[in-house]
């Protein structure tokens, strides 16, 4: 079986690519960022919006496509961020949606941010109206609309809504990475809003496995990828302190509008499709992420 992973150099993309290759699949990894080659992996270094013949051929000939490429980052910052999000999340997504044959399973990474947070502590269900807050979530809603159009035309399409993925390989600008770096350097951990806010923290390994199982299940439409259990920021900070064997202090700031008070996945549809849902051992996830980041710190 041959699978395509776009965004193969990204956080979830690297883990997904590794797991697919380890399972014996032939994988084509597409990314603008070069990847180290390995047996079972064909690397295509390309921009999805370039008219690259190798990319077109790979997308047309795959048995399954995981479209994870995009412009990440929930918070609005930086010059030109709105255009980059539209370009990388919407326009590039449209290019992939049009290039993959209708009969090929296409799994597209959206985001739990489209929900705008859990409503009164109730888990977010796939049928809930979307309430995007901020440009990132809005770009993902536009991408989801394109996916719905492909599905209506008979194209096999699954929209993935991952919840707060953590573990080895997490981007350095994400919350847990920032907290680990701050704790190592003796700086206070920056907290937006309150330590009592909750997040559905999902282990990157289990998120990737859920995506693989969804591809095999023939699932179509929108599917949450989360645990269905909220973890407080206080519990996450305690895990950081325990893993690094240090005391931590906090710098609490008002939360911006786009920062939800809670995120929580309704996992009933996921479990009905693949028979299980992720379970996160918070200490283990933090330990693995901290261990993976240490060699990078030593090189720097």
Task: State where each predicted segment sits.
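Active-site helix of classical SDR
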Residues: 139
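Conserved Rossmann-fold NAD(P)-dependent oxidoreductase catalytic core, especially the SDR/UDP-sugar
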Residues: 94-135
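Conserved glycine-rich Rossmann-like NAD(P)H-binding loop of the short-chain dehydrogenase/reductase
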Residues: 25-36
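NAD(P)H-binding glycine-rich loop region in Rossmannoid oxidoreductase-like domains
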Residues: 48-88
């Amino acid at each position: 079986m041959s699978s395509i992973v776009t965004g193969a150099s990204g956080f979830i993309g690297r883990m997904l690519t590794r797991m697919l290759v380890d399972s014996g699949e032939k994988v084509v990894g597409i990314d603008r960022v070069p990847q180290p080659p390995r047996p079972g992996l064909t690397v295509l270094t390309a921009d999805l919006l370039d008219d690259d013949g190798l990319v077109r051929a790979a997308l047309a000939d795959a048995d399954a496509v995981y479209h994870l490429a995009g412009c990440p980052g929930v918070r609005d910052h930086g010059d030109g961020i709105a255009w980059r999000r539209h370009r990388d999340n919407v326009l590039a997504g449209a290019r992939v949606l049009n290039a993959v044959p209708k009969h090929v399973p296409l799994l597209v990474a959206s985001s739990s941010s489209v929900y705008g947070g859990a409503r009164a502590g109730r888990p977010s269900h796939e049928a809930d109206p979307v309430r995007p807050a901020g440009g990132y979530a809005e770009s993902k809603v536009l991408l989801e609309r394109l996916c719905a159009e492909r599905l209506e035309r008979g194209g096999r399409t699954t929209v993935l809504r991952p919840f707060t993925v953590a573990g080895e390989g997490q981007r350095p600008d994400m919350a847990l990475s920032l907290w680990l770096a701050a704790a190592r350097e003796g700086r206070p951990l920056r907290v937006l809003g309150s330590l009592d806010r909750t997040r559905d923290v999902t282990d990157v390994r289990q998120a990737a496995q859920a995506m693989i199982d969804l591809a095999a299940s023939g699932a179509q439409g929108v599917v949450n990828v989360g645990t269905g259990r909220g973890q407080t920021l206080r519990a996450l900070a305690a895990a950081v302190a325990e893993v690094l064997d240090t005391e931590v202090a906090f710098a609490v700031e008002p939360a911006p509008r786009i920062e939800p008070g809670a995120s929580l996945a309704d996992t009933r549809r996921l479990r009905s499709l693949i028979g299980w849902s992720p379970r996160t051992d918070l200490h283990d996830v933090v330990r693995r992420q901290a261990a993976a980041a240490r060699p990078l710190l030593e090189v720097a």
